Design a protein with these regions (language model features):
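Extracytoplasmic/periplasmic substrate-recognition and gating elements
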Residues: 299-363
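Long, aromatic- and glycine/proline-rich binding clefts that accommodate carbohydrate-like moieties
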Residues: 357-413, 437-438
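Short, well-ordered beta-strand elements
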Residues: 51-65, 84-89, 112
Length: 439
Protein backbone atom coordinates (compact mmCIF):
# COMPACT_ATOMS: atom_id res chain seq x y z
CA UNK A 1 0.00 0.00 0.00
CA UNK A 2 2.80 2.42 0.90
CA UNK A 3 4.57 1.63 -2.38
CA UNK A 4 1.34 2.34 -4.34
CA UNK A 5 0.89 5.70 -2.58
CA UNK A 6 4.47 6.66 -3.34
CA UNK A 7 3.94 5.86 -7.01
CA UNK A 8 0.80 8.01 -7.17
CA UNK A 9 2.56 10.93 -5.48
CA UNK A 10 5.50 10.67 -7.90
CA UNK A 11 3.15 10.73 -10.91
CA UNK A 12 1.31 13.78 -9.58
CA UNK A 13 4.57 15.68 -8.99
CA UNK A 14 5.75 14.88 -12.51
CA UNK A 15 2.51 16.21 -14.00
CA UNK A 16 2.77 19.40 -11.95
CA UNK A 17 6.29 20.05 -13.22
CA UNK A 18 5.20 19.51 -16.83
CA UNK A 19 2.23 21.88 -16.47
CA UNK A 20 4.17 24.69 -14.79
CA UNK A 21 7.34 24.65 -16.89
CA UNK A 22 5.92 26.75 -19.86
CA UNK A 23 4.90 29.52 -17.49
CA UNK A 24 8.27 29.51 -15.79
CA UNK A 25 10.05 30.06 -19.09
CA UNK A 26 7.70 32.80 -20.41
CA UNK A 27 9.32 36.26 -20.75
CA UNK A 28 8.24 39.07 -18.46
CA UNK A 29 5.76 41.54 -20.02
CA UNK A 30 7.24 44.70 -21.49
CA UNK A 31 6.22 47.90 -19.73
CA UNK A 32 5.68 50.81 -22.14
CA UNK A 33 7.32 54.06 -21.06
CA UNK A 34 5.04 56.92 -20.12
CA UNK A 35 4.32 59.56 -22.74
CA UNK A 36 6.55 62.61 -22.50
CA UNK A 37 5.04 65.63 -20.80
CA UNK A 38 5.65 69.32 -20.98
CA UNK A 39 5.05 71.92 -23.68
CA UNK A 40 1.76 72.39 -25.44
CA UNK A 41 1.45 68.77 -26.51
CA UNK A 42 3.57 65.66 -26.82
CA UNK A 43 4.66 64.65 -30.30
CA UNK A 44 5.74 61.08 -31.08
CA UNK A 45 9.45 60.36 -31.03
CA UNK A 46 9.31 57.54 -33.57
CA UNK A 47 7.37 56.94 -36.72
CA UNK A 48 3.80 55.66 -36.02
CA UNK A 49 2.97 55.46 -39.69
CA UNK A 50 3.12 51.67 -39.99
CA UNK A 51 3.62 51.63 -43.75
CA UNK A 52 6.52 50.90 -46.03
CA UNK A 53 8.88 53.88 -46.37
CA UNK A 54 6.80 56.72 -47.78
CA UNK A 55 7.76 59.56 -50.10
CA UNK A 56 5.43 62.55 -49.85
CA UNK A 57 5.32 65.58 -52.13
CA UNK A 58 3.81 68.75 -50.67
CA UNK A 59 2.75 71.83 -52.66
CA UNK A 60 2.26 74.91 -50.46
CA UNK A 61 0.48 78.03 -51.73
CA UNK A 62 2.04 80.32 -49.12
CA UNK A 63 4.32 83.32 -48.81
CA UNK A 64 8.07 82.98 -48.40
CA UNK A 65 8.05 83.62 -44.65
CA UNK A 66 5.38 80.96 -44.12
CA UNK A 67 7.29 78.54 -46.35
CA UNK A 68 10.52 78.97 -44.40
CA UNK A 69 8.64 78.21 -41.17
CA UNK A 70 7.06 75.16 -42.81
CA UNK A 71 10.50 73.94 -43.90
CA UNK A 72 11.80 74.05 -40.33
CA UNK A 73 8.74 72.22 -39.02
CA UNK A 74 9.07 69.61 -41.75
CA UNK A 75 12.70 68.95 -40.83
CA UNK A 76 11.60 68.26 -37.26
CA UNK A 77 8.93 65.90 -38.60
CA UNK A 78 11.50 63.97 -40.65
CA UNK A 79 13.67 63.45 -37.57
CA UNK A 80 10.70 61.93 -35.75
CA UNK A 81 9.66 59.86 -38.78
CA UNK A 82 12.80 58.65 -40.57
CA UNK A 83 10.77 56.31 -42.79
CA UNK A 84 8.93 59.26 -44.36
CA UNK A 85 10.66 61.60 -46.81
CA UNK A 86 8.91 64.86 -47.69
CA UNK A 87 9.59 67.12 -50.66
CA UNK A 88 8.28 70.67 -50.20
CA UNK A 89 7.41 72.94 -53.11
CA UNK A 90 6.17 76.53 -52.90
CA UNK A 91 3.74 78.33 -55.19
CA UNK A 92 3.49 82.11 -54.89
CA UNK A 93 -0.06 82.90 -53.70
CA UNK A 94 -0.58 85.72 -56.21
CA UNK A 95 0.54 83.62 -59.17
CA UNK A 96 -1.36 80.55 -57.93
CA UNK A 97 -4.47 82.72 -57.55
CA UNK A 98 -4.19 83.96 -61.12
CA UNK A 99 -3.79 80.40 -62.39
CA UNK A 100 -6.72 79.25 -60.25
CA UNK A 101 -8.95 82.00 -61.61
CA UNK A 102 -7.96 80.99 -65.13
CA UNK A 103 -8.68 77.32 -64.34
CA UNK A 104 -5.01 76.54 -64.96
CA UNK A 105 -3.88 75.79 -61.42
CA UNK A 106 -2.21 72.44 -60.80
CA UNK A 107 -0.83 70.92 -57.58
CA UNK A 108 2.00 69.30 -59.60
CA UNK A 109 1.07 65.76 -58.62
CA UNK A 110 1.54 66.40 -54.90
CA UNK A 111 0.21 64.14 -52.14
CA UNK A 112 -0.60 67.09 -49.88
CA UNK A 113 -1.50 70.71 -50.65
CA UNK A 114 -1.65 73.84 -48.54
CA UNK A 115 -4.33 76.03 -50.13
CA UNK A 116 -6.68 78.92 -49.26
CA UNK A 117 -9.82 77.80 -47.45
CA UNK A 118 -11.98 79.16 -50.27
CA UNK A 119 -10.60 76.53 -52.67
CA UNK A 120 -11.35 73.49 -50.53
CA UNK A 121 -15.01 72.82 -51.39
CA UNK A 122 -14.38 73.23 -55.13
CA UNK A 123 -11.50 70.74 -54.96
CA UNK A 124 -13.65 68.30 -53.00
CA UNK A 125 -16.49 68.48 -55.53
CA UNK A 126 -13.99 67.85 -58.32
CA UNK A 127 -13.00 64.57 -56.65
CA UNK A 128 -9.45 65.74 -55.96
CA UNK A 129 -9.44 65.24 -52.17
CA UNK A 130 -9.63 62.64 -49.45
CA UNK A 131 -11.87 63.45 -46.47
CA UNK A 132 -9.83 64.79 -43.56
CA UNK A 133 -12.18 63.68 -40.77
CA UNK A 134 -9.75 61.01 -39.53
CA UNK A 135 -7.17 63.68 -38.71
CA UNK A 136 -9.56 65.19 -36.15
CA UNK A 137 -9.20 62.94 -33.11
CA UNK A 138 -9.59 63.70 -29.42
CA UNK A 139 -9.73 67.39 -28.56
CA UNK A 140 -8.82 68.29 -32.15
CA UNK A 141 -12.50 67.82 -33.05
CA UNK A 142 -13.64 70.85 -31.03
CA UNK A 143 -10.50 73.01 -31.18
CA UNK A 144 -10.82 74.80 -34.58
CA UNK A 145 -13.16 77.79 -34.76
CA UNK A 146 -16.51 77.39 -36.55
CA UNK A 147 -15.74 80.22 -38.97
CA UNK A 148 -12.91 78.09 -40.31
CA UNK A 149 -14.44 74.62 -40.22
CA UNK A 150 -17.62 75.79 -41.96
CA UNK A 151 -15.50 76.70 -45.00
CA UNK A 152 -14.01 73.20 -45.12
CA UNK A 153 -17.24 71.17 -44.98
CA UNK A 154 -19.18 69.78 -47.90
CA UNK A 155 -21.63 66.92 -48.27
CA UNK A 156 -21.31 65.95 -44.62
CA UNK A 157 -17.50 65.64 -44.59
CA UNK A 158 -14.61 67.83 -43.52
CA UNK A 159 -12.14 68.07 -46.41
CA UNK A 160 -9.20 69.94 -44.90
CA UNK A 161 -7.24 70.55 -41.71
CA UNK A 162 -7.04 74.27 -40.82
CA UNK A 163 -3.49 75.52 -40.22
CA UNK A 164 -3.77 79.28 -39.66
CA UNK A 165 -5.85 82.37 -40.38
CA UNK A 166 -5.10 85.98 -41.26
CA UNK A 167 -8.19 88.22 -41.42
CA UNK A 168 -8.14 91.77 -42.72
CA UNK A 169 -7.87 94.83 -40.50
CA UNK A 170 -7.92 98.56 -41.25
CA UNK A 171 -4.94 100.73 -40.36
CA UNK A 172 -5.71 104.42 -39.92
CA UNK A 173 -3.34 107.31 -40.43
CA UNK A 174 -4.53 109.31 -37.45
CA UNK A 175 -2.54 112.41 -38.44
CA UNK A 176 -4.26 112.61 -41.82
CA UNK A 177 -7.69 112.15 -40.24
CA UNK A 178 -6.96 114.73 -37.54
CA UNK A 179 -6.08 117.28 -40.20
CA UNK A 180 -9.61 117.00 -41.62
CA UNK A 181 -11.49 118.26 -38.58
CA UNK A 182 -11.41 121.15 -36.21
CA UNK A 183 -10.65 120.67 -32.56
CA UNK A 184 -13.51 118.93 -30.81
CA UNK A 185 -14.98 117.43 -33.98
CA UNK A 186 -15.24 113.65 -34.23
CA UNK A 187 -16.76 112.91 -37.65
CA UNK A 188 -13.45 111.64 -39.00
CA UNK A 189 -12.37 109.85 -35.85
CA UNK A 190 -12.14 106.11 -36.55
CA UNK A 191 -14.01 103.96 -37.15
CA UNK A 192 -15.79 106.03 -39.79
CA UNK A 193 -19.53 106.03 -40.39
CA UNK A 194 -20.88 105.52 -43.95
CA UNK A 195 -21.50 109.27 -44.12
CA UNK A 196 -17.90 110.04 -43.15
CA UNK A 197 -16.59 107.55 -45.72
CA UNK A 198 -18.65 109.23 -48.44
CA UNK A 199 -17.34 112.66 -47.46
CA UNK A 200 -13.72 111.57 -47.01
CA UNK A 201 -12.47 111.90 -50.64
CA UNK A 202 -13.93 115.39 -51.03
CA UNK A 203 -12.70 116.52 -47.62
CA UNK A 204 -9.14 115.48 -48.47
CA UNK A 205 -9.29 117.48 -51.71
CA UNK A 206 -10.82 120.47 -49.91
CA UNK A 207 -8.03 120.65 -47.35
CA UNK A 208 -5.34 120.29 -50.02
CA UNK A 209 -3.91 117.08 -48.62
CA UNK A 210 -2.21 115.03 -51.33
CA UNK A 211 -3.44 111.76 -49.87
CA UNK A 212 -5.56 108.91 -51.11
CA UNK A 213 -8.68 108.15 -49.15
CA UNK A 214 -8.08 104.37 -49.25
CA UNK A 215 -5.22 101.94 -49.90
CA UNK A 216 -6.28 98.37 -50.64
CA UNK A 217 -5.20 95.23 -52.50
CA UNK A 218 -6.74 95.61 -55.93
CA UNK A 219 -6.37 91.91 -56.74
CA UNK A 220 -8.06 90.34 -53.71
CA UNK A 221 -11.87 90.18 -53.57
CA UNK A 222 -11.67 89.41 -49.86
CA UNK A 223 -10.03 92.80 -49.30
CA UNK A 224 -12.98 94.37 -51.12
CA UNK A 225 -15.48 92.45 -48.96
CA UNK A 226 -13.56 93.49 -45.85
CA UNK A 227 -13.90 97.17 -46.78
CA UNK A 228 -17.61 96.81 -47.65
CA UNK A 229 -18.15 95.20 -44.25
CA UNK A 230 -16.26 98.07 -42.66
CA UNK A 231 -18.32 100.67 -44.55
CA UNK A 232 -21.67 99.06 -43.72
CA UNK A 233 -20.71 97.74 -40.26
CA UNK A 234 -21.98 94.29 -41.22
CA UNK A 235 -20.58 90.79 -41.48
CA UNK A 236 -18.26 90.47 -44.45
CA UNK A 237 -20.25 87.75 -46.20
CA UNK A 238 -23.56 89.68 -45.96
CA UNK A 239 -23.22 91.08 -49.52
CA UNK A 240 -23.16 87.50 -50.81
CA UNK A 241 -26.66 86.71 -49.58
CA UNK A 242 -29.96 88.18 -50.70
CA UNK A 243 -31.08 88.40 -47.07
CA UNK A 244 -27.96 90.36 -46.17
CA UNK A 245 -28.46 92.79 -49.05
CA UNK A 246 -32.14 93.33 -48.28
CA UNK A 247 -31.45 94.29 -44.67
CA UNK A 248 -28.44 96.58 -45.16
CA UNK A 249 -30.43 99.72 -46.00
CA UNK A 250 -28.76 100.09 -49.37
CA UNK A 251 -25.25 100.10 -47.89
CA UNK A 252 -23.93 97.74 -50.58
CA UNK A 253 -25.06 100.05 -53.38
CA UNK A 254 -23.61 103.07 -51.54
CA UNK A 255 -20.28 101.31 -51.09
CA UNK A 256 -20.08 100.22 -54.73
CA UNK A 257 -20.98 103.73 -55.90
CA UNK A 258 -18.32 105.35 -53.71
CA UNK A 259 -15.63 103.00 -55.03
CA UNK A 260 -16.61 103.84 -58.61
CA UNK A 261 -16.98 107.59 -58.18
CA UNK A 262 -13.84 108.10 -56.09
CA UNK A 263 -11.59 105.46 -57.63
CA UNK A 264 -8.91 108.05 -58.49
CA UNK A 265 -8.23 108.39 -54.75
CA UNK A 266 -7.69 104.65 -54.22
CA UNK A 267 -4.11 103.36 -53.89
CA UNK A 268 -4.08 99.74 -55.07
CA UNK A 269 -0.40 98.80 -55.35
CA UNK A 270 1.37 96.08 -53.34
CA UNK A 271 1.84 96.75 -49.63
CA UNK A 272 5.64 96.77 -49.69
CA UNK A 273 7.92 98.19 -46.96
CA UNK A 274 8.25 101.32 -49.11
CA UNK A 275 4.45 101.65 -49.18
CA UNK A 276 4.21 101.51 -45.39
CA UNK A 277 6.80 104.27 -45.03
CA UNK A 278 4.91 106.46 -47.49
CA UNK A 279 1.62 105.61 -45.78
CA UNK A 280 3.04 106.74 -42.44
CA UNK A 281 4.13 109.97 -44.17
CA UNK A 282 0.57 110.69 -45.32
CA UNK A 283 0.12 108.70 -48.55
CA UNK A 284 -3.43 107.67 -47.57
CA UNK A 285 -5.99 108.04 -44.81
CA UNK A 286 -6.62 104.31 -44.36
CA UNK A 287 -5.34 100.96 -45.61
CA UNK A 288 -7.06 97.58 -45.61
CA UNK A 289 -4.39 94.95 -44.91
CA UNK A 290 -3.95 91.46 -43.55
CA UNK A 291 -3.45 91.41 -39.79
CA UNK A 292 0.01 89.85 -40.12
CA UNK A 293 1.12 92.48 -42.66
CA UNK A 294 -0.13 95.33 -40.48
CA UNK A 295 1.52 94.10 -37.29
CA UNK A 296 4.77 93.36 -39.10
CA UNK A 297 4.78 96.82 -40.70
CA UNK A 298 4.33 98.65 -37.42
CA UNK A 299 7.17 96.65 -35.87
CA UNK A 300 9.57 97.55 -38.68
CA UNK A 301 8.71 101.26 -38.91
CA UNK A 302 10.57 103.77 -36.79
CA UNK A 303 8.91 104.96 -33.61
CA UNK A 304 7.89 108.31 -35.07
CA UNK A 305 6.48 106.67 -38.21
CA UNK A 306 4.52 104.04 -36.29
CA UNK A 307 3.11 106.69 -33.93
CA UNK A 308 0.98 108.06 -36.76
CA UNK A 309 -0.72 104.71 -37.40
CA UNK A 310 -3.36 102.74 -35.51
CA UNK A 311 -4.47 99.15 -36.20
CA UNK A 312 -8.25 98.82 -35.89
CA UNK A 313 -9.57 95.29 -35.26
CA UNK A 314 -13.06 96.40 -34.25
CA UNK A 315 -14.44 94.68 -37.36
CA UNK A 316 -13.67 91.38 -35.64
CA UNK A 317 -16.47 92.16 -33.19
CA UNK A 318 -19.02 91.53 -35.94
CA UNK A 319 -20.59 88.14 -36.54
CA UNK A 320 -18.28 87.15 -39.38
CA UNK A 321 -15.12 88.31 -41.13
CA UNK A 322 -13.30 86.27 -43.74
CA UNK A 323 -10.68 84.29 -41.78
CA UNK A 324 -8.16 84.37 -44.63
CA UNK A 325 -7.03 80.89 -43.65
CA UNK A 326 -4.75 78.31 -45.23
CA UNK A 327 -5.58 74.64 -44.74
CA UNK A 328 -3.97 71.29 -45.50
CA UNK A 329 -5.75 68.94 -47.92
CA UNK A 330 -4.90 65.37 -48.92
CA UNK A 331 -4.86 64.35 -52.56
CA UNK A 332 -7.21 61.54 -53.53
CA UNK A 333 -4.34 60.16 -55.63
CA UNK A 334 -1.81 59.76 -52.84
CA UNK A 335 -0.40 56.26 -52.31
CA UNK A 336 0.51 57.00 -48.70
CA UNK A 337 -2.72 58.00 -46.97
CA UNK A 338 -1.64 57.20 -43.44
CA UNK A 339 1.69 59.02 -43.74
CA UNK A 340 -0.11 62.02 -45.28
CA UNK A 341 -2.59 62.14 -42.39
CA UNK A 342 0.20 61.98 -39.81
CA UNK A 343 2.05 64.82 -41.56
CA UNK A 344 -1.11 66.95 -41.70
CA UNK A 345 -1.84 66.36 -38.02
CA UNK A 346 1.66 67.28 -36.89
CA UNK A 347 1.97 70.34 -39.13
CA UNK A 348 -1.20 71.70 -37.49
CA UNK A 349 -0.21 70.83 -33.92
CA UNK A 350 -0.56 73.52 -31.28
CA UNK A 351 3.20 73.90 -30.99
CA UNK A 352 3.48 74.52 -34.72
CA UNK A 353 0.54 76.94 -34.67
CA UNK A 354 2.32 78.99 -32.02
CA UNK A 355 5.53 78.90 -34.02
CA UNK A 356 3.63 80.11 -37.09
CA UNK A 357 2.19 83.00 -35.09
CA UNK A 358 5.51 84.07 -33.59
CA UNK A 359 7.42 83.91 -36.86
CA UNK A 360 4.81 85.01 -39.42
CA UNK A 361 2.03 86.75 -37.47
CA UNK A 362 -0.63 84.39 -38.83
CA UNK A 363 -3.14 83.48 -36.12
CA UNK A 364 -3.65 80.01 -34.59
CA UNK A 365 -6.86 78.09 -35.29
CA UNK A 366 -7.16 76.36 -31.90
CA UNK A 367 -9.43 77.98 -29.31
CA UNK A 368 -7.35 76.99 -26.30
CA UNK A 369 -4.28 78.91 -27.51
CA UNK A 370 -5.99 82.28 -27.03
CA UNK A 371 -4.95 82.87 -23.45
CA UNK A 372 -2.40 85.09 -21.75
CA UNK A 373 -0.13 82.09 -21.25
CA UNK A 374 0.75 81.97 -24.95
CA UNK A 375 1.28 85.69 -25.55
CA UNK A 376 -1.25 86.15 -28.36
CA UNK A 377 -2.24 89.82 -28.38
CA UNK A 378 -5.34 89.41 -30.56
CA UNK A 379 -8.03 88.70 -27.96
CA UNK A 380 -10.25 86.28 -29.85
CA UNK A 381 -10.90 84.35 -26.66
CA UNK A 382 -13.24 87.20 -25.64
CA UNK A 383 -15.47 86.66 -28.68
CA UNK A 384 -19.07 85.69 -28.00
CA UNK A 385 -20.39 82.30 -28.99
CA UNK A 386 -22.25 83.85 -31.94
CA UNK A 387 -19.52 86.23 -33.08
CA UNK A 388 -16.33 85.87 -35.08
CA UNK A 389 -14.61 83.43 -35.16
CA UNK A 390 -17.38 81.24 -33.76
CA UNK A 391 -20.04 82.01 -36.39
CA UNK A 392 -20.16 79.76 -39.50
CA UNK A 393 -19.73 81.33 -42.92
CA UNK A 394 -22.90 82.00 -44.90
CA UNK A 395 -21.00 81.41 -48.15
CA UNK A 396 -19.06 78.16 -47.99
CA UNK A 397 -20.12 75.96 -50.88
CA UNK A 398 -18.20 74.86 -53.98
CA UNK A 399 -19.27 77.98 -55.91
CA UNK A 400 -17.46 80.35 -53.55
CA UNK A 401 -14.08 80.17 -55.28
CA UNK A 402 -15.38 80.82 -58.79
CA UNK A 403 -17.72 83.62 -57.68
CA UNK A 404 -14.94 85.33 -55.76
CA UNK A 405 -12.73 85.05 -58.84
CA UNK A 406 -15.39 86.87 -60.89
CA UNK A 407 -15.73 89.59 -58.27
CA UNK A 408 -11.94 89.93 -58.10
CA UNK A 409 -11.63 90.33 -61.88
CA UNK A 410 -14.30 93.03 -61.90
CA UNK A 411 -12.68 94.76 -58.92
CA UNK A 412 -9.28 94.81 -60.64
CA UNK A 413 -10.94 96.11 -63.82
CA UNK A 414 -12.51 99.03 -61.99
CA UNK A 415 -9.18 100.05 -60.49
CA UNK A 416 -7.13 99.74 -63.69
CA UNK A 417 -9.77 101.55 -65.76
CA UNK A 418 -10.76 98.64 -68.00
CA UNK A 419 -14.22 98.53 -66.41
CA UNK A 420 -16.24 101.76 -66.53
CA UNK A 421 -17.91 102.92 -63.30
CA UNK A 422 -21.41 102.43 -64.73
CA UNK A 423 -20.60 98.87 -65.79
CA UNK A 424 -19.02 98.22 -62.40
CA UNK A 425 -22.19 99.23 -60.56
CA UNK A 426 -24.39 97.06 -62.78
CA UNK A 427 -22.20 93.96 -62.84
CA UNK A 428 -21.15 94.13 -59.21
CA UNK A 429 -24.76 94.04 -58.04
CA UNK A 430 -25.35 90.95 -60.19
CA UNK A 431 -22.23 89.19 -58.92
CA UNK A 432 -23.10 89.80 -55.29
CA UNK A 433 -25.88 87.27 -55.70
CA UNK A 434 -27.21 84.76 -53.24
CA UNK A 435 -24.88 82.06 -51.96
CA UNK A 436 -26.17 78.91 -50.33
CA UNK A 437 -24.29 77.60 -47.35
CA UNK A 438 -23.54 73.92 -47.93
CA UNK A 439 -22.57 72.33 -44.66
Amino acid sequence: MARRKSTVILVLLTLAVLLLSPWASAPAPTVKPASPSGGTEALPSASPVGEEPAELAVTAVVGMSEFETLQAQNEAFRLRHPDVSVELRRQDPAEAGRRWNGEEWSPDGADIWLVPNEWVAALAVAGELLPADEVFVGEAISEPFDSLVSQLKWNGYVWAVPRDMDPYVVVWNTEVLSALQAEGETKFSPPLSPEAWRELPGKLAETGLNAGWLAIDGSDPLALLAWIGLFANRREDAPLTSAGQASDGGALEQALSLLAEARSGIRSGPLTPAFWRSFAAGEAAAVVARNSAATRALRTLSGSEAAALAIDRSAWNRDFVWPGGVSIVLSAKTKHEEAARVWAAEMTSKDNQLQNYRQTGRLPVSRSLYSEAYGIVEALSDSGLRGFPNEPALASGPEVASRLAEIGALWSGLLDGSVAPERWKALATELFADFKRDR
